């Protein structure tokens, strides 16, 4: 199955989610929960091929468990991709030095409804058609502007790989137009 062969395909700037500096993601319970809100998205594109992206389960209000999934517009350009969606939860390495495929990941089937998207800002909001499995976390969010010099981190499945962790510091806001970038 090609989707399992994706393991190891991401770049070296993406750290295994089980690794990191001494204050890495699994040293802090809140950050561990945020990582548990991130899933590998696998879906069919209109041409018939299979694509992979990342999505994060988000909460809309305290106490609400409506399964809203935040992802990228370039993944969900039509409702068809959302309709065919499967989410791979807990697709994490078993240890820091292990590139092995985990045996306990859960594939959630049932698809989703595409609720909204923005090509300009490259976001998509979906609602899963079935409830996520036990142990998946609903991540909080904030629409406030992040100032310069603030530490940020991201959990994702680059190139369909096991869950990775990237972190850095903001240095102001940058606007990128990928449609006009070299190589397009």
Where are these regions (language model features)?
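Serine endopeptidase catalytic core focused on the charge-relay Asp
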Residues: 1-184
């Amino acid at each position: 199955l090609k989707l399992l062969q994706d393991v190891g395909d991401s770049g070296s700037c993406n750290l295994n989610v089980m690794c990191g500096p001494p204050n890495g993601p699994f040293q802090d319970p809140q950050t561990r929960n945020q990582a548990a809100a991130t899933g590998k998205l696998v879906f069919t594109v209109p041409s018939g091929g299979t694509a992979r992206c990342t999505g994060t389960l988000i909460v809309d209000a305290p106490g609400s468990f409506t399964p809203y999934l935040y992802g990228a517009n370039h993944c969900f350009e039509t409702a068809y991709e959302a309709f065919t969606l499967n989410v791979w939860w807990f697709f994490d390495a078993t240890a820091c030095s292990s590139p092995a495929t985990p045996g306990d990941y859960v594939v959630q089937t049932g698809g989703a409804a595409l609720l909204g998207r923005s090509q300009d800002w490259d976001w998509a909001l979906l609602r899963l058609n079935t409830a996520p499995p036990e142990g998946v976390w609903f991540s909080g969010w904030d629409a406030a502007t992040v100032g310069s010099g603030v530490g940020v981190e991201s959990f994702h499945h680059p190139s369909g790989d096991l869950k990775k962790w990237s972190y850095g510091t903001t240095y102001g806001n940058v606007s990128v137009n990928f449609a006009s970038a070299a190589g397009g």
